[in-house]
Curated annotation (Swiss-Prot):
Compartment(s): Cytoplasm
NCBIfam families given in the database record: PRK15409.1
Catalytic activity of the protein: glycolate + NADP(+) = glyoxylate + NADPH + H(+); (R)-glycerate + NAD(+) = 3-hydroxypyruvate + NADH + H(+); (R)-glycerate + NADP(+) = 3-hydroxypyruvate + NADPH + H(+)
Name under which the protein is recorded: Glyoxylate/hydroxypyruvate reductase B
Gene that encodes it: ghrB
GO cellular component: cytosol; plasma membrane
Length: 324
């Protein structure tokens, strides 16, 4: 008899078929308490869980006594109670490598669109404001040869550094938990403390996961240390930034502009002051949102669940010691 798994995110037909070759698949719309209650028998028997954008906490796990592995279609897993999963010896799988290049593209797009004011001036053209040769009030700022500061030199940070160094001749500063020899050798990147990075960078790109240590890592103190001409980019996790402090820094002119793919609360409220600022490019968490990459992430998540329930956790496992 095939193991039972619960799928709470739609999959392309071919990936669903692959999942069904290995498991009895039960599809649900979400992991809300109502859904769990209505499908209590299915949740009680499930050995696997696959999906994204839903919280998996101790309350849910109490309803799933046979759960052995959960696979998320994402690299981030701050919506999972890792301690609760680990305590119950449940494997947590994620997709850390598939989206690297695409998210780096998004970061570079935010750098370019904020510096050159692409969104703002495009809207002015649509509004009929382009009636003569443009003047300085339409101008942006250069990207090439400007200093890029990267906070978090992981896979995505490396991919961004590659684009910035080779494509735009940008000097690279970085701050991370440890020195990154490859970044220093390939891109001539310079390791520095966070204060130095903030003071010297023309662009500050934040690429950090959300943890207890990184929550509100960026606040009023950090923005005050940046150049008034600096542009802030966040494509990591929204709560790493104190959003009210960011808004204040933009309003006071402490920083020049911001390109944001993530926010403290998502979706972003239509009443957010960020949406009324011409110098803010706000996009709806599109970091990995291409057809090709989202398919690749889903395929990876399917393979991860198959591997996990077969006892193979050599890669893409957040808590591999559970399998020991």
């Amino acid at each position: 008899m095939k193991p039972s798994v619960i799928l709470y995110k739609a999959l392309p037909d071919d990936l669903l078929q692959r999942l069904q070759e290995h498991f009895t698949v039960h599809q649900v719309a979400n992991l809300s308490p109502q859904t769990v209650e209505q499908n209590a028998a299915i949740f009680a028997e499930a050995e696997g869980l696959l999906g994204s954008n839903e919280n998996v906490d101790a309350v849910l796990l109490e309803k799933m006594p046979k759960l052995r592995a959960t696979s998320t279609i994402s690299v981030g897993y701050d919506n999972f109670d890792v301690d609760a999963l680990t305590a119950r010896k449940i494997l947590l799988m994620h997709t850390p490598t598939v989206l690297t290049e695409t998210v780096a593209d998004t970061l570079m797009a935010l750098v370019l669109s904020t510096a050159r004011r692409v969104v703002e001036v495009a809207e002015r053209v649509k509004a009929g404001e382009w009636t003569a040769s443009i003047g300085p009030d339409w101008y942006g700022t250069d990207v090439h040869h400007k200093t890029l500061g990267i906070v978090g030199m992981g896979r995505i940070g490396m991919a961004l550094a590659q684009r910035a160094h080779f494509g735009f001749n940008m000097p690279i500063l970085y701050n991370a938990r440890r020195h990154h020899k490859e970044a220093e050798e390939r891109f001539n990147a310079r390791y520095c403390d966070l204060d130095t990075l903030l003071q010297e960078s023309d662009f500050v790109c934040l690429i950090l996961p959300l943890t207890d240590e990184t929550h509100h890592l960026f606040g009023a103190e950090q923005f005050a240390k940046m150049k008034s001409s600096a542009i802030f980019i966040n494509a990591g996790r929204g709560p790493v930034v104190d959003e009210n402090a960011l808004i204040a820094a933009l309003q006071k002119g402490e920083i020049h502009a911001a390109g944001l793919d993530v926010f403290e609360q998502e979706p972003l409220s239509v009443d957010s002051p960020l949406l009324s600022m011409a110098n803010v490019v706000a996009v709806p968490h599109i970091g990995s949102a291409t057809h090709e990459t989202r398919y690749g992430m889903a395929a990876c998540a399917v393979d991860n669940l198959i591997d996990a329930l077969q006892g193979k956790v050599e890669k893409n496992c957040v808590n591999p010691h559970v399998a020991d």
